[in-house]
């Protein structure tokens, strides 16, 4: 324990480490503020003027509007919202045109527009997948079989995307059949808020890798651990202590940073909107049976696992290489490889088996949850979020073991 405390103290005494930790905490606040600042809406006044609201004022105004549409997403409520929408369009013209009265839009369209979000999808063309125009949908077609209609659309999508893999199609339909219906809606929080959670996790991963790179390689360069390595517990025990100290620092930093980040978001957008079903924020045919509050927890857990798996890879490289710069460069390449692989080739094994597969931009864990990517091998199909988590879990232990093994076998030049 004393050796552990000394190692932790040694890490924290580094000016570079302290600077990176401060940056991590500052980014937590700054990146939570950004999606809040993006919020905006025009509020019509009684005298005919318009007030532009931004930030917290816009969020508060929207919350008051959305209260009327909060509740279970039943076919009757969707039908009523569609009838109101179509009535307004027939009377005032398309909602997107400038001539549409702002007061009517705020009063009759905004409160219920998220109820209609999945309607175009549910009635999409089965061949092309193009969503139906809301004006072309007969309200009488929205009956008790609305959720069956959604399942039919998922079947069409999976048939188009996984045409040669019936196992993937069947697994997606089985997973969708397990969803709790009717869905629940309490609008408020934006997609940007969740995107910035993932972006913050990416920056945290970069900062943690930058700190971890010198764990062993830095000592090789300076010879700082030469004497300790000759003692009874100077190899395996020292390696384990260094790794535990590094992991402790990264776990605490991650949890503090992400907690501050999410608390700021939830304080701004409110917690009622976290009861909203995942399908009502992204796609009506999404597979996860979770709400937005559970989504936050899942993103944090998956993010922490991916960060630790990536750091364990960096620690292995640090134990293997002789200088910090080489470790840092290779680690950054490993960290960003899934992102580049996904952009170049889409969802493949290469983009999902790296320790950092759940971290990034288009390839991040959030987007994998919202997508329908299945990887196929033989007659089996695997949903990419499951592959990402399993790979990261295995690699965390494998790279940690290899780091210890490499450090024990290291020979001082």
Give, region by region, the residue ranges found by the protein language model.
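Aromatic- and glycine-rich beta-strand/loop motifs that create alpha-glucan
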Residues: 1-18
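Alpha-helical transmembrane segments of multi-pass membrane transporters/translocases
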Residues: 17, 306-314, 371-413
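Residue-level recognition of transmembrane alpha-helices
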Residues: 21-24, 242, 331
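Secretory targeting signals
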Residues: 26-89, 138-219, 240-320, 364, ...
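Transmembrane helix segments
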Residues: 33-34, 324-357
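Cytoplasmic juxtamembrane regions at transmembrane-helix boundaries
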Residues: 222, 230, 314-335, 408-413
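Short helix-to-coil transition segments within interhelical loops
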Residues: 229-235
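Short hydrophobic, aromatic-rich alpha-helical segments embedded in or entering the lipid bilayer
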Residues: 349-373
């Amino acid at each position: 324990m004393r050796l552990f405390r000394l190692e932790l103290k040694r890490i924290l005494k580094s000016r570079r480490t302290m600077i990176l930790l401060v940056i991590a905490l500052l980014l937590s606040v700054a990146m939570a503020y950004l999606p809040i600042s993006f919020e905006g809406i025009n509020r019509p006044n009684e005298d005919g003027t318009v007030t532009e609201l931004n930030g917290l004022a816009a969020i508060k105004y929207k919350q008051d509007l959305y209260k009327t549409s909060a509740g279970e997403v039943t076919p009757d409520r969707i039908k009523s919202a569609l009838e109101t929408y179509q009535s307004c369009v027939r009377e005032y013209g398309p909602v997107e045109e400038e001539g549409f009265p702002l007061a009517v839009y705020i009063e009759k369209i905004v409160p219920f527009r998220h109820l209609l979000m999945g309607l175009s999808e549910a009635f999409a063309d089965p061949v092309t997948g193009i969503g139906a125009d809301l004006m072309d949908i007969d309200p009488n077609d929205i009956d008790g079989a609305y959720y069956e209609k959604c399942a039919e659309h998922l079947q069409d999508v999976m048939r188009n995307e996984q045409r040669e893999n019936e196992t993937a199609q069947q697994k997606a339909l089985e997973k969708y059949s397990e969803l709790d219906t009717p869905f629940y809606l309490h609008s408020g929080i934006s997609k940007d808020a969740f995107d910035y959670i993932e972006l913050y996790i990416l920056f945290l991963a970069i900062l943690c890798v930058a700190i971890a790179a010198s764990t062993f390689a830095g000592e090789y360069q300076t010879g700082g651990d030469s004497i300790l390595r000759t003692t009874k517990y100077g190899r395996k025990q020292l390696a384990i202590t260094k790794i535990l100290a590094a992991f402790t620092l990264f776990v605490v930093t991650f949890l503090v940073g992400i907690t501050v980040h999410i608390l700021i978001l939830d304080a701004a957008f409110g917690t009622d909107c976290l009861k909203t079903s995942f399908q009502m924020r992204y796609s009506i045919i999404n597979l996860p049976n979770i709400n937005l509050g559970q989504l936050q927890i899942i993103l944090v857990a998956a993010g922490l696992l991916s960060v630790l798996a990536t750091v364990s890879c960096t620690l292995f490289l640090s134990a293997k290489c002789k200088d910090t710069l080489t470790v840092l460069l290779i680690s950054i390449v490993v960290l960003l490889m899934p992102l580049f692989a996904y952009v170049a080739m889409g969802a493949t094994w290469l983009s999902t088996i790296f320790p950092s597969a759940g971290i990034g931009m288009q390839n991040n864990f959030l987007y994998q949850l919202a997508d329908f990517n299945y990887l196929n091998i033989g007659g089996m199909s695997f949903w990419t979020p499951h592959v990402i988590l399993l790979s990261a879990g295995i690699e965390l232990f494998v790279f940690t073991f290899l780091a210890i093994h490499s450090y024990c076998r290291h020979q001082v030049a």
